Amino acid sequence: MHSSALLCCLVLLTGVRASPGQGTQSENSCTHFPGNLPNMLRDLRDAFSRVKTFFQMKDQLDNLLLKESLLEDFKGYLGCQALSEMIQFYLEEVMPQAENQDPDIKAHVNSLGENLKTLRLRLRRCHRFLPCENKSKAVEQVKNAFNKLQEKGIYKAMSEFDIFINYIEAYMTMKIRN
């Protein structure tokens, strides 16, 4: 009986302590998000560095998939939507194909995808960074070019992932300053 009373007290104290923090946990994570962003981008870059050589060696095309127009969309009024669509594009179209390119890189691509999912989740929790609904023409151009490249598209998209990270950084830096 004594241990169940102790357990009830612990549950009650945990609940009381968690209750005030529940409303502010999201706010706190949003407050600290700008400070955590460099670490999140570093994690993305570190994860990408494990597969970068593999995909860049297989990318035999000279043209860029991620063009300057995409960066301009990231910096413009469509920045939120462009970022959201590009994250979705990489998670749903590029990463699943990239994982199947070689068994030796599958875990590394998976890790890269998990880091990107974590970033997306944090962006969605902090509506100030991802409050959007419009479509980006630049993202549509990226998707069309990717599809036209067929099997070579995966190498192109993955070999340029570092450019995507730089665009994310440019967008987030702009949002943090505003």
UniProtKB/Swiss-Prot annotation:
Protein's UniProt keywords contain rRNA-binding: no
PROSITE patterns attached to this UniProt entry: INTERLEUKIN_10
Cysteine disulfide links: 30-126, 80-132
GO molecular function, one term: growth factor activity
Superkingdom of the organism of origin: Eukaryota
Keyword Transmembrane assigned: no
GO cellular component, one term: extracellular region
Transmembrane regions: none
Record Pfam families: IL10
Tissue: Produced by a variety of cell lines, including T-cells, macrophages, mast cells and other cell types.
Gene3D superfamilies, sorted: 1.20.1250.10
Signal peptide: 1-18
Keywords (A to Z) from UniProt: Cytokine, Disulfide bond, Glycoprotein, Secreted, Signal
Predominant subcellular localization, coarse grouping: secreted
Subunit: Homodimer. Interacts with IL10RA and IL10RB.
Function: Major immune regulatory cytokine that acts on many cells of the immune system where it has profound anti-inflammatory functions, limiting excessive tissue disruption caused by inflammation. Mechanistically, IL10 binds to its heterotetrameric receptor comprising IL10RA and IL10RB leading to JAK1 and STAT2-mediated phosphorylation of STAT3. In turn, STAT3 translocates to the nucleus where it drives expression of anti-inflammatory mediators.
Name listed for the protein in its UniProt record: Interleukin-10
Species whose genome carries this gene: Homo sapiens
Gene that specifies this protein: IL10
